[in-house]
A protein has these predicted regions:
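Conserved acidic
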Residues: 1-195
Length: 195
């Protein structure tokens, strides 16, 4: 039930100002920035409210994409980032224990607890004390792709251009496929908390 890339529904009509954004290697960059990997997970804010709302939307005959329309993150993450003292969250820790905390307490634990932590939009708490395997691999692939792009640029107009361009494209596909592999139940790297 993870959301994919956000694509807004078009708004019909003439508009004076429009804009678009395309972030370079968005998903690989997010994985690297949050140090997302199974070995870096500290805890998971249980998505009780979010999953209940998703179930309601699906029961009404709508698709999961309609639930996520206009939303950036799960309800629990939003409460944490808003430092809601009246909202209770359950955090499932990587050691198998659980804690009840207010959303504000979760925020303070992550951002003011004196530990190198980060929280993702789905409420997963990651440590960045040491680089994760997957973020490290993506960093290497990204650097390799930049090298291949430079070689393709140098070879523009020669017989070698297609060779280097296709090689950099393979790296791009590897980079962009990593997020999908992490959230594909058939993948050996599957972990719902990463999505």
């Amino acid at each position: 039930q993870a959301a994919g890339a956000y694509v807004a529904f078009p708004k019909k009509g003439m508009h004076d100002w429009i804009g678009a954004i395309d972030i370079n290697s968005l998903y690989p960059s997010a994985i690297r920035a949050l140090n997302m990997g199974p070995e870096t997970i500290v805890g998971q804010v249980r998505q009780t409210r979010t999953l209940a709302s998703i179930d309601e939307v699906i029961a009404s005959g709508k698709g999961i994409a309609e639930f996520w329309e206009g939303k950036f993150a799960c309800f629990e993450y939003e409460s944490v980032m808003n430092r809601d003292i009246g909202q209770t969250e359950i955090v499932d820790w990587s050691d198998g224990t659980s804690s009840e905390m207010s959303s504000a307490e979760v925020y303070n634990f992550v951002f003011h607890g004196g530990q190198p932590l980060m929280i993702s939009g789905n409420g997963t708490i990651f440590s960045y004390a040491s680089k994760g395997v997957i973020p490290g691999l993506l960093e290497r692939w990204y650097a390799e792709r930049k090298e291949l792009q430079a070689k393709a640029k140098e070879a523009y107009g020669t017989d070698m251009f297609d060779f280097w361009d296709k090689r950099q494209l393979v790296k791009k596909i590897n980079l962009n496929s990593a997020y999908g592999a992490l959230l594909n139940a058939g993948s050996r790297f599957f972990d719902q908390r990463l999505g």
